[in-house]
UniProtKB/Swiss-Prot annotation:
Chain residues that bind Zn(2+): H146, H150, E223
Cofactor entry: Zn(2+)
Species the sequence originates in: Bordetella petrii (strain ATCC BAA-461 / DSM 12804 / CCUG 43448)
InterPro entries on file: HtpX_protease, Pept_M48_protease_HtpX, Peptidase_M48
Active-site residues annotated for this sequence: E147
Name of the protein in question: Protease HtpX homolog
Gene Ontology CC: plasma membrane
Domain of life the protein comes from: Bacteria
TM helices/strands, residue ranges: 4-24, 40-60, 161-181, 197-217
Cross-referenced HAMAP family: Pept_M48_protease_HtpX (MF_00188)
Keywords: Cell inner membrane, Cell membrane, Hydrolase, Membrane, Metal-binding, Metalloprotease, Protease, Transmembrane, Transmembrane helix, Zinc
Membrane topology: Multi-pass membrane protein
Cofactor: how and how many bound: Binds 1 zinc ion per subunit.
Amino acid sequence: MKRIFLFIVTNLAVMVVLSATLRVLGVDRYITAQGINFQSLLILSVVIGFTGAIISLLISKPMAKWSTGARVIDPAAPGGSREAWLVETVHQLADRAGIGHPEVAIYDGSPNAFATGAFKNDSLVAVSTGLLDSMTEEEVAAVLGHEVAHIANGDMITLTLIQGVVNTFVVFLARVVGYFIDRTVFRNERGVGAGYFITVLVCEIIFGLLASIIVAWFSRQREYRADAGSAQLMGSREPMMRALARLGGLEPGELPKSFEASGIAGKGGLGAIFASHPPIQARIAALQHMRVV
């Protein structure tokens, strides 16, 4: 949950800064000077929407390290046999998945793990000390396979594209609603007034919350795919099923809110529609019915 929250917060922060800057520069007033110029508004919405998502993606790896306090393991000088095993296991899984070797990191915390990075060949896999201490090596390897599968599937890129599209609609619709509220409720006939800017701000918050349901749905689907990817990389579904079962009996480690959707375990937030992860039981059931080639 931690990683996705940070991604979304960074994304929204960039959107807000861009929106505010463009308002100060009078772009909103220009677009609505002669009624709404939908073509110009759409271009503005795309610029604001995708800029936030892309910047969030590009800084996702350093932000993840900073927010979790993760320590990257030097492959040439690991701090003991456990760290050496971690690096070797991640590299082997990456080779099977056909991607470059990710950086491998450890952070202190309850059982969890995550993967992040803008590019498949320049990514990061991090695992908590709590997870390492509570699982067998085979179960840890399955969790690492799950994270490597996220990278191989290009989940962060897809999330960025989805977030960009969602942002575009949020920005576009908020300004359309703001324009008509300013005209019909506040009776402003010249340019745009305070009613427009207040309505846009409120609508961006409301529409952004509703849009997060779409992002959460995608996150749940990618968890099923990553579970299946782990089973394929491990050559068996059993290790991942055992790892999930163990997680189901443990308190999921909380990642910083911005990165929650990247973790192996999450609490789901405000109800099922906002949950970044499916229920553990549903994930195990999906693995039971999959075919491992």
